UniProtKB/Swiss-Prot annotation:
PROSITE patterns in UniProt: RIBOSOMAL_L6E
GO terms assigned for molecular function: structural constituent of ribosome
SUPFAM superfamilies per the UniProt record, alphabetical: Translation proteins SH3-like domain
Keyword annotations of the record: Acetylation, Cytoplasm, Endoplasmic reticulum, Isopeptide bond, Phosphoprotein, Ribonucleoprotein, Ribosomal protein, Ubl conjugation
UniProt protein name: Large ribosomal subunit protein eL6
PANTHER family linked: 60S RIBOSOMAL PROTEIN L6, LARGE RIBOSOMAL SUBUNIT PROTEIN EL6
Naturally occurring in which organism (per UniProt): Mus musculus (Mouse)
InterPro entries: 60S_ribosomal_eL6 (IPR000915), Rib_uL2_dom2 (IPR014722), Ribosomal_eL6_CS (IPR049633), Ribosomal_eL6_KOW (IPR041997), Ribosomal_uL6_N (IPR005568), Translation_prot_SH3-like_sf (IPR008991)
GO biological process, one term: cytoplasmic translation
Cross-link (Glycyl lysine isopeptide (Lys-Gly) (interchain with G-Cter in SUMO2)): 5
Residue(s) carrying Phosphoserine: 135
GO annotations of cellular component type: cytoplasm; cytoplasmic ribonucleoprotein granule; cytosol; cytosolic large ribosomal subunit; nucleolus; nucleus; postsynapse; postsynaptic density
Function recorded in the entry: Component of the large ribosomal subunit. The ribosome is a large ribonucleoprotein complex responsible for the synthesis of proteins in the cell.
Length: 296
């Protein structure tokens, strides 16, 4: 009929299925809500990267000055506590008495007399001489550090450049406390005795002698080699021109020490072929030989 709705031809789904579909549709929404809610009820804060509050205009130059940043950061509110240090009271030094009163006998001498403890010098210099002051940082020669060149080791063959034995080759034994080197020829080979020499005036060669087993006497020190002053003879009546100067003579102790050291080194030198002739020969420069180009 006119004015009436046409009957719905679509089939209606059962109610059970509709209810099930409503429950399934409500589950993801509930899950989404559960994810968004924080257990404490607050949203988690995002971690911000650490950066300065003073933006950089150019490399090394900030927008705000140091005083401006001091007020922006409110650094004036901070309380600084300095470490407490105990200050010990200085002990008063006892005053040293300059004078002493002494009793003096005699009726007319007054009974006492004031005497100075520190007496003034009896004689004074005719010219003013400035007093030498110890400078800070400078140590005496006895306290200097003794350094040895890396090329000089016990048993190294050295070439002496100065003195009466210049040009001769010797064997280095050890370094003394003064920094000088103790060397020997040996005496039988090149007539160089036990003596001291400075490492400045020596050329170290690559040739070495094994002296690890050699025992050097402990009394071979700087005092042992110190030159003794010869006494000047006093003139007597009638012997003005007949007096003779005292001459230096080698002691028996030196001769014994020389033999003791050389007897230990000689077998080791003879064991190496051509080493004996090398030590006996003298070093010299000829035409076309340049020291800075030579390999020792």
């Amino acid at each position: 009929m006119a004015g009436e709705k046409a009957p719905d031809t679509k089939e209606k789904k059962p109610a059970a299925k509709k209810a099930g579909s409503d429950a399934a549709a409500s589950r993801p929404r509930a899950a989404k809500v559960a994810k968004k809610v924080h257990p404490k009820g607050k949203k988690p804060k995002k971690a911000k990267p650490h950066c300065s509050r003073n933006p950089v205009l150019v490399r090394g130059i900030g927008r705000y000055s140091r005083s401006a940043m001091y007020s922006r950061k409110a650094l004036y509110k901070r309380k600084y506590s300095a470490a407490k240090t105990k200050v010990e009271k200085k002990k008063k030094k006892e005053k040293v008495l300059a004078t002493v009163t002494k009793t003096v006998g005699g009726d007319k001498n007054g009974g006492t007399r004031v005497v100075k403890l520190r007496k003034m010098p009896r004689y004074y210099p005719t010219e003013d001489v400035p007093r030498k002051l110890l400078s800070h940082g400078k140590k005496p020669f006895s306290q200097h550090v003794r350094r040895l060149r890396s090329s000089i080791t016990p048993g190294t063959v050295l070439i002496i450049l100065t003195g009466r034995h210049r040009g001769k080759r010797v064997v280095f034994l050890k370094q003394l406390d003064s920094g000088l080197l103790l060397v020997t020829g040996p005496l039988v080979i090149n007539r160089v005795p036990l003596r001291r020499t400075h490492q400045k005036f020596v050329i170290a060669t690559s040739t070495k002698v094994d002296i690890s087993d050699v025992k050097i006497p402990k009394h071979l020190t700087d005092a042992y080699f110190k030159k003794k002053q010869l006494r000047k003879p006093r003139h007597q009546e009638g012997e003005i021109f007949d007096t003779e100067k005292e001459k230096y003579e080698i002691t028996e102790q030196r001769k014994a020490d020389q033999k003791a050291v050389d007897l230990q080194i000689l077998p080791k030198i003879k064991a190496v072929p051509q080493l004996q002739g090398y030590l006996r020969s003298q070093f010299s420069l000829t035409n076309g030989m340049y020291p800075h180009k030579l390999v020792f």
